[in-house]
Amino acid sequence: MLTFIGLGLYDQKDISVKGLEAIREADVVYAEFYTSRLMGATLEDMQELYGKPVKVLMREDVEQHPKDTVLSDAVDKKVVFLTGGDAMVATTHVDLRLRAKKMGIETRLIHGASIQSAVCGLTGLQNYRFGKSATIAFPYKDIISETPYDTILMNKKNGLHTLLFLDIDREKGYMTVNRGIELLLKVEERRKEGAVAGALCVGIARAGSPSPCVRAGRIEELQAFDFGGPLHIMVMPADLHFLEEEALQDLAGLKLG
């Protein structure tokens, strides 16, 4: 049996009662924190609350060699697999579940709070008005991916907001809103298609914590704003509904005019 459990957004206390019960009933507990992580909790904090040791897996363990760990144990044991946010938002977790199914392993999902819904709650932007999302990745060999720029351009043409995840890298750390903006503006400078220059941007930091930061303004203004510690995420809105405009003014400090 393999149970996927979403841990929520910020610390060890975000887990659901159902998720906590599943952990305490498990024979083996695995976790991965390369797609997302709980910035308000250490591994020791989690283990103390859960009452179980947690084995943390690296990307290659989950994506390349899951049969050596999670899947081999789940054949004849109760195994739980912990992730930040909601367990099935990351494609790699869907792949792991499908591999388990092919091996005849029963799977179960216990959902957790997701950053997608948290962004709507913190900003007042309407959930149904979001289009395709994208990830701003750290440059590879000085090459900046233009996929986020293309996604923003396409969504804006359709009147849709764009949620932009910010990269997490074992060596480079956590990308900030400021760095994400810098990379988008570099693509804008080269492409000059008007997707981001002078555009409205919303930055969010530490969603789910006692002190989240939410700030809206022109993208060039936010580049200099201090959002504080991670994790960060961004939204590039399309034209706003009047209620969204009011929400960003009241909740995110948007100044019009």
Curated annotation (Swiss-Prot):
InterPro entries: 4pyrrol_Mease, 4pyrrol_Methylase_sf, 4pyrrole_Mease_sub1, 4pyrrole_Mease_sub2, Dphthn_synthase. Pathway: Protein modification; peptidyl-diphthamide biosynthesis. It comes from the Archaea. It catalyses: 2-[(3S)-amino-3-carboxypropyl]-L-histidyl-[translation elongation factor 2] + 3 S-adenosyl-L-methionine = diphthine-[translation elongation factor 2] + 3 S-adenosyl-L-homocysteine + 3 H(+). Keywords: Methyltransferase, S-adenosyl-L-methionine, Transferase. One of its GO terms (biological process) is protein histidyl modification to diphthamide. Signal peptide: none annotated. Its EC number is 2.1.1.98. It is an enzyme of class 2 (transferase). S-adenosyl-L-methionine binds at residues 9, 86, 89, 114-115, 166, 207, 232. GO terms for molecular function: diphthine synthase activity. HAMAP family: Diphthine_synth. Belongs to the diphthine synthase family. Homodimer. NCBIfam families: dph5 (TIGR00522). S-adenosyl-L-methionine-dependent methyltransferase that catalyzes the trimethylation of the amino group of the modified target histidine residue in translation elongation factor 2 (EF-2), to form an intermediate called diphthine. The three successive methylation reactions represent the second step of diphthamide biosynthesis. This is Diphthine synthase.
